[in-house]
UniProtKB/Swiss-Prot annotation:
Its EC number is 3.6.4.-. It catalyses: ATP + H2O = ADP + phosphate + H(+). InterPro entries: AAA+_ATPase, ABC_transporter-like_ATP-bd, ABC_transporter-like_CS, ABCF_EF3_subfamily, ARM-like, ARM-type_fold, eEF3_ABC2_chromodomain-like, eEF3_chromodomain-like_sf. The keyword Magnesium does not apply. Its main location: cytoplasm. Monomer. The keyword ATP-binding applies. This is Elongation factor 3. The lineage of its organism: Eukaryota, Fungi, Dikarya, Ascomycota, Taphrinomycotina. It comes from Pneumocystis carinii.
Amino acid sequence: MPGNVVSPKVLMDLIPKLKISMQETDKNEVIKNSEQHSSVSWDPDTCENLYITLEEQIESKDTLAREQALKALLLTLDATNKRVEPYLVRLLPRVLKQVGLEKVAAVRTQASTVAEDIIKTMNPYAVKTILSHVTNSIKTSGKWMEKMCAFRLLDMLVEKAPCQMSYRLPELIPILSESMWDTRTDIKNQARKTMTSVCTLISNPDIDKFIPVLIDCIAQPEKVPETIHTLGATTFVQEVHASTLSIMVPLLYRGLNERETTIKRKSAVIIDNMCKLVEDPYIIAPFLPKLIPTLEHIKETIGDPECRSVVNRSLATLIRVGNVKEGKIPEVLNIAKPENCMETLLSILKGQELVPVSDVYLNYISCIASQLIDEKNNEVVDWDVNISPYLQPIILKADINCIIDQFRKRSISGFHSSSAESEEEEGEDLCNCEFSLAYGAKILLNRTSLNLKRGYRYGLCGPNGSGKSTLLRSIFNGQLEGFPTELKTAYVEHDIDDTESKTSVFDFIANDPSVVVKNKQEVISSLLEHSFTEDMLSIPISNLSGGWKMKLALVRAMLRQVDILLLDEPTNHLDVKNVAWLENFLTSQTHITSIIVSHDSKFLDNVVQAIIHYEHFKLKKYMGNMSKFITLVPSARSYQDISMSEIEFSFPEPGYLEGVKTKQRAICRMRDIEFQYEGTSEPQIKNVSLQVSLSSRIAVIGPNGAGKSTLIKVLCGELIPQKGEVWCHPNLRIAYVAQAAFVHLGSHENKTPSEYIQWRYRTAEDSETIDRASRQLTENDEHLMNKIFKINGTSRKIQGIHSRRKLKNSYEYECSFLVGENVGEKNERWVPLPSMNNEWLPRGELIESHSKMVAEVDMKEALKSGSFRPLVRKEIEKHCESFGLDAEIVTHSRIKGLSGGQKVKLVLAAGSWLKPHVIVLDEPTNYLDRDSLGALSKALKSFEGGVVIITHSVEFTKNLTEEVWSVQNGQMTPSGHNWVQGQGTGPRLQEQEEEDTFDALGNKIEAKKKAKKLTSSELRKKKKERMARRKKGEEVFSDEDD
């Protein structure tokens, strides 16, 4: 930039002299001798005239005139003189044109210097008006030197105005991408360098390391598939801005148009994960016209259903984030357009006493304001500093600060909602922090804030998998960014760690270093005060029921001196009495803050003072209890009424049971059952009789420790009663989901749900049932199996039972034998007989001595009657989809990464794989969110088989169950039952047509249809037809119709 800056009046006089003064010394002498040097003010009218003159001179056909005009223009450049900037920008396209057209190197160099100095003097917030000229040269100029100069100007702008330029990337990157394919090598190389420079403005740590690869993909599209694979393993946790989308969307668009389905799918997954982190619909709006039609085309044409579901999910995310309504993509925000700012400015200046000024000047001010609006900058200081220098020369009397403030408020108002600030609670702040939270490759919360007050009770609500438990664990483990480390917390989750299962109840409390009471008597008193009996203090925790385990964990948390109680599903397993006890404790605490995760809406209604709700990766606080929250957020009405759930589950059809003609007929029966655990003083259940049919809808209720779970385990064969009889239909299939549902998944956490189901049913039977007590041989069983049968005059013992067939109203079984030699003597021995000597024995003869072997054969026949399902990925995904688990979770996520609710859904799906006739659920409401509870309730209601449920949730069972088994002190009292002998009444069940069957690899087995036997009249008709054909001389065979 020159050292001497000359006023407009002086320059107007100097320009004719500069035309004939070729030497620099002559030029300086003219300037030096001018009496008016720097004495005339830069008023807008003089500036306007000066730059009109310079514009004419620059476009003159006279080379000398152009050079002198450029020299004169260089003299006007002054970074401190803001009022000349609008006119300099107006001349920039002409200056750039001279770089490309001028054949005289001196003039070309002069033009290039002027262009660069214009960039140096510009206000950084004026990038919009500058860029329009620079990018126009790149797009339209046919002169390569002009383009090269434009690229250099972009590099300078990146250094001068990095923040402002980052907002312009969506416009810049497509232009630079096109230039990277220019036929001229110089342009191509410079475009790549400028692209690399521009991309340094992308501030997103998630993709920083991939930017060089993303630039490579623009120049080398063959690298797109590999880059998509690499990005597919990236965890997106940072908020996504327009600059990030500007470099990612071109790659993803190409990925969606690749031929390989896997690349299309991964591109859709990345779009879904990344766009969830876009907070403003206007950020994503410019990219929607490219992405949405492409995804819709893939959805309509792709053959892979799993890929289609991923594409659907991505589409749903784009529609939600982009605020697309009725298929109409919203227009890009126009509030920040310079012409709109100009209109606002003119309306404010109307009626003011102004110096006459051109639209060029006002447009420059509008472009600065437009950039401030783009950045959502509402700071008074920034508006004053960047607008005031340009308004001051043209406003004569009015208060400039007042005008600028009015301009700011009216311009920025479109970004701010008129709604009132959300209500805040009063009191001492425990924490007020901002953080992001992720689990594995999944973003849970993005730059959200958490404010907690002392003594308040907060309900933490959100759907399964949103990250509620992860947030509580992160707080407890001190892993939450910005959370005060000095705060003491206690975390109570769904179950006590297995490592402490052998610890006694007393030691569990006394050995905890965080517990305040250390005196033995104080520990005992505290436990007795909370309803534990003296007998319970010495028993191991593993002997406690689920409800008492939860209560023990809660008592320990209460006895710690903590600031915050973190309760994860605290009402799980608790009966009504203990839920009331917990409510009373929590509401009585004025010093302890509680954060509670629970799907029990009544409990939350009675306890919490505010709801913290997961909404689009943010935590939003609503003051009041659950009922008030529902009124504020009507979309969450399923929290209060599970029947309002909009999602659906479905259980598979159970299939036909041989001999069962109506749904009232008993398919499972218990008579005078008694069971007692080893080491206990009295039976857990006694004198229990019951029966279950296909129409059963049974709720098992009772206080904690009454024996409900024990009763169910005996019914399902998990436990063997010491007295009484348990009978089940030979072909009966029961799905049992235990109270501690996660026990099914314990050793499979590194498998995907699909792999777990494949493992569980790899032999066609349920591997989880192999270790059931009803299938284990005891010493007594082995003694009974030594029974000797007299067959065909020989003494025989049964070696194995292999198959079964119908025998009147029962069955008979094919048995292989050992034949006895010298039976009863010292040298007695038993020799296996060949299979040709197998015999069929009736069920009645075998059941007393070989009941468990008979049961094994019955179970295999039951599996056959259920029809084998292909144990392949697509079938498993389809089955799990019926329980709210999408293919992404089933096939591509490990079990250890699933939430509690998702694990329960998986256990339900896995348990029902064999199409059970009876579903037995022990506390199914634990961990499931409200929508899932509603879906499960409706699915059980429409299920064609029997249902037995243990639950303390009256809300869940009130419209579902008709029969109640009330368990108190080991005694069961049934009510509402309709037990019948024989078939009973009601519609007759018909055996359904056989479904398609498959082998283990999923190949369909074509069943051969049995030839239909012809009637005597049909045989006579066939015979006549043959004789008629023989008369005609045709060759006919009598057996051709057989």
